[in-house]
Amino acid sequence: FDRDSDLLKKRINETAEDYSKIYEYIRAIKFLSVNNLGYDIILRPHPSEDIETWEIFLKDIPNVHVIRKGPINAWVHNSFAVMHNSCTTAIEATVSKKPVITYIPFEQKYASQLANKLGHRVKSLDELLKKVNNVFETRENNNQNELGNSLPDILLKKLYLDDELAAEKMVKVWEKIE
């Protein structure tokens, strides 16, 4: 901090924004839990987050579960949608053609711009409830493969996907090494 006097201020502002996001996310989960159409809400903490903290924040809410078991792709695959704010799981959900709901309740300076450009962007609790319930109601009518045959432009600029398995590509690289 001695070399850059603005660095301390930036770190404090980033941390304050993170705490505000957590507070708003908890409010959103509690709001959805009371006003939803009968679905359960799974909160999967980031690997760097303390799961016990989330369990304390969300305890005694019957249809909310804090779970970190297994790989994220299984949870994405078995969900009807993914709600997030600044989470790279939105990228995985988009690639998997799973509906993504990006909840941005206030202007954020330090958030992941790529992840927050994906999915249905909502700013208020009422917008969030309407979008989540709409996705839930129409989930059986939507063929997930029809959510879009191509990825959003923002991801096409960042990802290259083809039909070749990663293991096959590695073998080809190894075979080229003399």
Where are these regions (language model features)?
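Conserved catalytic-core segment of nucleotide-activated headgroup transferases in glycan assembly
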Residues: F1-F57
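Catalytic binding pocket for nucleotide-activated donors in carbohydrate/polymer assembly enzymes
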Residues: L7, E55-I61, T88-D162
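Structural alpha-helical scaffold elements that stabilize or flank donor/cofactor-binding regions
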Residues: A74-V76, L114
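C-terminal alpha-helical cap of glycosyltransferases
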Residues: Y160-E178
